[in-house]
Amino acid sequence: MTDAPKVRYIRIWTGRTRKEQFEEYSLYLNEFGVRKIERIPGNIRVEMFRALRADHAEFKVISYWPSEEAIRAFSGEDITLTRHLERDPDYLLELPTHVELFEVY
């Protein structure tokens, strides 16, 4: 039995859409964002969270990684830069430039 890789870093992306786009963007983000991240070598896990707020819909994608090097293979040298999906400009109220990065303690 092999041990699963230990999570050392999490990468958190946050985006907002109009409330009317909640379901449509959920499907799009899951299919073209979450599923893509799941297939990236080195990725341990990825989860999508969503919530309807008073005046918008909010989404978070949290990906779990064993090392900065594993993230870099996916994101490039600056591991905090956002990698937008092709249709994000059609949905998102603003295009975030960076993700949050946390070391798991």
Regions found by a protein language model. Give the residues of each.
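Short, surface-exposed, polar/charged, turn-prone segments marking secondary-structure boundaries
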Residues: 39-43, 64-66, 73-77, 87-93, ...
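A broad, low-specificity signal for short, low-complexity segments enriched in glycine/proline
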Residues: 5-11, 20-26, 59-64, 97
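Intrinsically disordered, low-complexity acidic/polar segments
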Residues: 1, 22-24, 70-72
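Low-complexity, intrinsically disordered short peptide segments enriched in small/polar/basic residues
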Residues: 7, 34-37, 59, 68, ...
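Short low-complexity stretches enriched in small and charged residues
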Residues: 14-22, 27-31, 53-58, 105
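Glycine-rich beta-strand-turn "strand-cap" elements at beta-sheet edges
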Residues: 1-7, 47-57, 83-105
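Short amphipathic alpha-helical segments
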Residues: 19-45, 79-88
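Short, well-ordered beta-strand segments in beta-rich or mixed alpha/beta enzyme
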Residues: 9-16, 45-77
